[in-house]
Every structure is written in C-alpha cells, then in structure tokens.
C-alpha cells in the first residue's frame, strides 16, 4: 500500500453509529477506510456486510483499553500508509439505567473505556496524523447535561481555557475514587457516569486542539468533539428518534472538512453546528425553532 493513499479509521465500528460512519466514509472519502472493532469475528462480519453493499472497507482489530492492541494498529498504519489522515474515535460503552452493576463499578468501567481508552488512542495516533488531517471525538450532549449538574467549582475547572491534560486526568480519576467512597454527590459530581466520561472526552478534545495549534500550527489539522444525537443503537435504545445513519452525519461532516477549511477546531459540534461548550442543550437556538 502506498503512503500516498489516504486513510480514514473509525473505532468501535462493527455496529451502530460507528458502522454507519464507516459506510458513509466508504462512499465519500477519497481513500481507504479502516473499520476497527474489539471482536475480530464481529468486525469481519461488519466488513462483509458492507462488501455486500459494494463497498470496500478494510478491517483491523482494536481494543481501545489495550495498549498493545493500539500499538499494533499504529504499526499497521505506519507500514501501510505512513500515517493517518482521518481518525474518528467512536468506541464507547454505557450501562442501561436498570443495570444492577454497583454504581462505582459502572463508573470505573465506563471511565476506563470512554475516557482513558479514547485518550490512549489519541496519545498513540495523534503523532501519526498527516497535515490537513481530521480528528473527530464522538462525545455527547449527555456530557453537557452532566457538566451542568456538577458544582460551580467543577464547572469552572472543566470550562477553563488553560486546564491541562494532567489536571483533567486527575479529575476523571477523582470521580471514580469518589464513587468508590460513596461521596461523589458530596464532592459536586453528576450522577451520570456516562455523562462525566463524556465531559472528559469533550474537554480532552479542547486540550488536544490547543496543543495542535501550538505545536503543529502549519499542518492545518482540525480536531473537534461532537454529539451524534440520541440514536437507535444498543446503547441509545429503541425509543431514540434518530437512525444510526442520521447520527453519523455530524461525525462524517467533521471528518470530511475540506482541506482549505480553517475551522471548526477545538469545538463542540452537534447537528453540524458549533455550540458553546457548557451551554445546556435546551438552550441551543435551533432546538425550539
């Protein structure tokens, strides 16, 4: 494979929104599209399904909580393509409301995948992103809701323009510890484990965008967080109003921003629109339009 061939990669892509993103990228992206999944059999089955539609994704195994798995993917991308043009971090988990797993265990497992896993992928793959590359971190307005349920002190920290990656990791670890000690409400946290992890993903995106601006200004890489909306998936449930295909629209829009685009960068985007970080979803100007 020539290093001149462009390549896009989607994590957690064997079903749901990730699968729909891969399908759209296969149709619209000028280059190879790599579908990744933790489970090889499910990932390969997803590739076969898309091949039956006349599309040609590639498959590579990826478990975002396994550093060895991430590094094997890095080696593949370096060898086959000399880097990466588009990264969509979609892999995530959520516990259903009626799940009997103890709250602190839910917090630990959700944080391990949604925040720490996404961070590990970014740590390893961002250095491979080529000039004019695009990075999309799939977050959620559930993170915005959770932010608005946090104490003013925590909100101030998460909205800070100067928060560091180390400070953010410390806060995410503190949330998990506070749930173990039964004091997370007393310490000012939301009750939504999923929401808190998505606060982390959104703030991490702002931090990485800032670093790219400072360290690789001439490369015109654009990195954003987005919310696909409430989507009918295993995670979103059958009552959600959006199909996975509609949910894929905003991530794909950000993944395919034209090469001469100056933005958005470091923003939170939903319905293809930039919204101010931390503003409650009910206040988005088009919600009641």
Swiss-Prot record:
Question: Which residues hold substrate?
Answer: 140
Please give the GO cellular component terms listed in this UniProt entry: cytoplasm
Q: Which residues form the active site?
A: 194 (proton acceptor)
Q: Does the keyword Glycoprotein apply?
A: no
Catalytic activity from the UniProt record? a secondary alcohol + NADP(+) = a ketone + NADPH + H(+); prostaglandin E1 + NADP(+) = 15-oxoprostaglandin E1 + NADPH + H(+); prostaglandin F2alpha + NADP(+) = prostaglandin E2 + NADPH + H(+); prostaglandin D2 + NADP(+) = 15-oxoprostaglandin D2 + NADPH + H(+)
Give an example GO molecular function.
Answer: 15-hydroxyprostaglandin-D dehydrogenase (NADP+) activity
Q: Name one Pfam family in it.
A: adh_short
Residues bound to NADP(+): 10-34, 63-64, 90, 194-198, 231-233
Q: For binding glutathione, which residues are annotated in this chain's numbering?
A: 95-97, 106, 193-194
Function description: NADPH-dependent reductase with broad substrate specificity. Catalyzes the reduction of a wide variety of carbonyl compounds including quinones, prostaglandins, menadione, plus various xenobiotics. Catalyzes the reduction of the antitumor anthracyclines doxorubicin and daunorubicin to the cardiotoxic compounds doxorubicinol and daunorubicinol. Can convert prostaglandin E2 to prostaglandin F2-alpha. Can bind glutathione, which explains its higher affinity for glutathione-conjugated substrates. Catalyzes the reduction of S-nitrosoglutathione.
**What is this protein called in UniProt?**
Carbonyl reductase [NADPH] 1
The source organism is Sus scrofa
């Amino acid at each position: 494979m020539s290093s001149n061939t462009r390549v896009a990669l989607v994590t957690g892509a064997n079903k749901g929104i990730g699968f729909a993103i891969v399908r759209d990228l296969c149709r619209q992206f000028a280059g190879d599209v790599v579908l990744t999944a933790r489970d090889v059999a499910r990932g390969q089955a997803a590739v076969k399904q898309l091949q039956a539609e006349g599309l040609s994704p590639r498959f590579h195994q990826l478990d975002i909580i396994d550093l060895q798995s991430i590094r094997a993917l890095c080696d593949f991308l370096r060898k086959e393509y000399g880097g990466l043009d588009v990264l969509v971090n979609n892999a995530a988990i959520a516990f259903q409301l009626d799940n009997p797993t103890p709250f602190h265990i839910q917090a630990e497992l959700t944080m391990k995948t949604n925040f720490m896993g996404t961070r590990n992928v970014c740590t390893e793959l961002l250095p491979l992103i080529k000039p004019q590359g695009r990075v999309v971190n799939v977050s959620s307005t559930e993170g915005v809701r959770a932010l608005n349920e946090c104490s003013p002190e925590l909100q101030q920290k998460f909205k800070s323009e100067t928060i560091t990656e180390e400070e953010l990791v410390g806060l995410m670890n503190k949330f998990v510890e506070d749930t173990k000690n039964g004091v997370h409400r007393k310490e000012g946290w939301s009750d939504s484990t999923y929401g808190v992890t998505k606060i982390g993903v959104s703030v991490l995106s702002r931090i990485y965008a800032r670093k790219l601006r400072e360290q690789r200004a001439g490369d015109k890489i654009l990195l954003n967080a987005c919310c696909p909306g409430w989507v009918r998936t295993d995670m979103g449930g059958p009552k959600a109003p959006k199909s996975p295909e509609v949910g894929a629209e905003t991530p794909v829009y950000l993944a395919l921003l034209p090469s001469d685009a100056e933005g958005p960068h470091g923003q939170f985007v939903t319905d293809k629109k930039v919204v101010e970080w931390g503003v409650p979803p009910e206040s988005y100007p088009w919600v009641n339009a």
